């Protein structure tokens, strides 16, 4: 099966052409609730989950970003149903339940602002690739660590301490205190809308843009260079673009021909500027 390619078809048709254990990482934000009817198309999410399990490599990861709609004053629970489906029906492990906190929330008159979405990180057994991102510590945290003193001992060349008791046990905590960064939490705050999600104006022709930074950070976290990244609901093409920019291969499925035209423009502009070695093609034939 050809990679670095967008397939204009149902993702089940695309995955049917993939051998077992083919994909390293899937990053996607599927249509949900009433959006399940997507530009006139409907999706069988249970079979999608099962096929994703089949085509994912051992240790591979699926990042599934989803939210709930409120219907008749009650949230639909789509997010939780999805997590149960992937674990109990498809066979994935739920490796982490992460939160995407949006800095631009929509107001509501009867409840607090809904400013987050779930990011379920499913894995096929233990993840084979984990590159945890780091961020700067807060000013308060840095001040607290500066005021802390280590256990008595002799300072070593690498900055750590050696216990006085002669056990040769190095105090890693002391060395870690000198570090001004820490591993990020599983709550990621990202701006969205306007020029925050992307600077590609054509992408805004899609009703729900996947933020580039969000796709970028998951791709870095759960894959390595030259790995294969898949998005079964490619939308405006963000996952493919960020895979290219991070020197990963990609495959995308997008059932809407209208949205495929958006993807084609974004990928060609990105590929021509950064990675001329990547050849992007749109396919309207299921067998190509």
Whereabouts are the PLM-identified features?
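Core catalytic lobe of class I
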Residues: 1-262, 267-270, 288
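Acidic, low-complexity intrinsically disordered tails
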Residues: 276, 280-288
